[in-house]
Amino acid sequence: SLEEPDKKILKEKTNLDRFVKIVGVDQKSNGFEAEINLSKKELLKEEKISNKAGPTYTLAEIFKAIELTMGDENYQKALEKRGIKDLSLIQIDPWPGGGFVKKNIKNGNRALKAISFLKDSEKDNAYARPIQGLIAHIDLTENKVVEVEDHGVVEVPKAHARYDKDGQESLRENPKEIAITQPEGVGFSVEDNLISWEGWQLRASIDPIEGLALHQVSLNNRPIFYRAGLSDMVVPYGSSDPMHWWKAVHDGTE
């Protein structure tokens, strides 16, 4: 992500070097932070991250967790116990452990939990049909499923939740046309990341942790905010069900 310059430096100078910060993980699950000067093409520093913390999970790790779970013998036996044999209809969703990691996973190892859903066809909405009571625990560092947690067979819902045309018994009549016109053009302007509207000016950027960030927000040239971002928004599931009690989704920053 872009390493934003200090507020004081940005106000004093216009021609600044551009810096980026990389938070990554290597193939041995070691986290690291690196800072790079893009203007001079220099690596300024690289530091190891404590094993008490870690970078965001990568897509490669997500796909690896799905592959390991799908190929695990105990997981397949748990599906068979539920009468499920066609693995092509299984959707696996890996989740962060929410700070609750199995004791047989070494401290500092990258770990995920996987929950599953059963589709009745390739285009089905799998989230309407959860496979309850089944959780796979994956050690990404060791490349294996360490445990399949099975809380007993619960019948998979039969109803689907598809909203496509083919998934409906009948369709409603077409709504009446809505026409929104601006004969004199729009009332705002966008130039690169600078947005201007009715005396307001702001710059917008996307931060990999915070999401949308607003910079140098002003009204009629009067400063309002130097920077505004959403630091966090956690959605705890608050359920005692073994499938959900450990979930605390960072919807605003994850």
How does the language model describe each region?
Residues 1-85:
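Post-signal-peptide, soluble extracytosolic/periplasmic N-terminal scaffold domains
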Residues 52-56, 60-254:
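Beta-strand/loop-rich accessory regions of lumenal/periplasmic or secreted enzymes
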